[in-house]
């Protein structure tokens, strides 16, 4: 039965609802099921949610970057009467028609090429933030434990620490360095919407708004966007993680999260028992679309690469870059991950190797 909550009357009540959404989602997921939520649009369009969204956006210097309508947060919302602002956003939810996205190009760190960034209109940004506030706790409770990009209380340092732990504890030194070709530009809208529904977003009005957001075209380029999530939208990182969670779930169920007949309290006990099976070891660490899979032999690494390529094509309509997806023995060569170079070198440890990061 779908869960439904009253709309929040204060920002304190909104935080309580966020906690309740997370807790219920987590409990159902950990019990082996998936949650179901309806009535989410009422929470998203509540006055307290709109206030919170505006506070979140105005603290970002990007709030003064105009979209195609040339409007900014300070001039067109913060200086307007409060009842007008709330009514305008609630009207946007009721009759949602996103404006086209203004595209700008920014430099990629350490590279000569530029990255496209989509700038939604300020009203659409507020709507997106209202939606993110409500959707994030539901989805966060179900995401893979070792994806670290664009998530609360997580960062690249934690991803690197996880790699260190895997190397130290398992001795899985063969690495598949994953690179998905134009990942964010090729996200399939239909698969994404189905995944959101699968993860508990049963309010079809919310799904229709997300679908409209995804299809908002880019000014001077196209009227309708048929695939991808616009980089620059406030909800885009969350939606990208929802999509890539399909891959996370598939990889982790092959080894790390594969259910065993007996439930082991300690991960090490589970690891020892799995080593006695014919399963192929595979430890995934992901940060946005950058990821590695650690395994124990070259043959297993090549097996992971081939099976992952097939899975991405068949289930997600994505493609591994054959040139950039590498197989590396990190006892002999550095891997590049999240701007760092990582290698195992001879040293005093139980396995005879210690990590070195540059």
Predicted regions, residues:
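Non-catalytic, polymerase-adjacent accessory regions of viral genome-replication enzymes
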Residues: 1-83
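Duplex nucleic acid-engaging cores and interfaces of nucleic-acid transaction enzymes
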Residues: 2, 13, 117-132, 142-143, ...
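Residues immediately flanking
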Residues: 68, 133, 178-180, 297, ...
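Short hydrophobic/aromatic beta-strand micro-patches
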Residues: 76, 120, 294-296
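Amphipathic alpha-helical blocks
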Residues: 77-98
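Conserved polymerase palm-domain catalytic core
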Residues: 85, 100, 104, 145-146, ...
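Structured, charged N-terminal subsegments at the starts of enzyme catalytic cores
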Residues: 86, 111-114
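Basic, alpha-helical interaction scaffolds
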Residues: 349-358
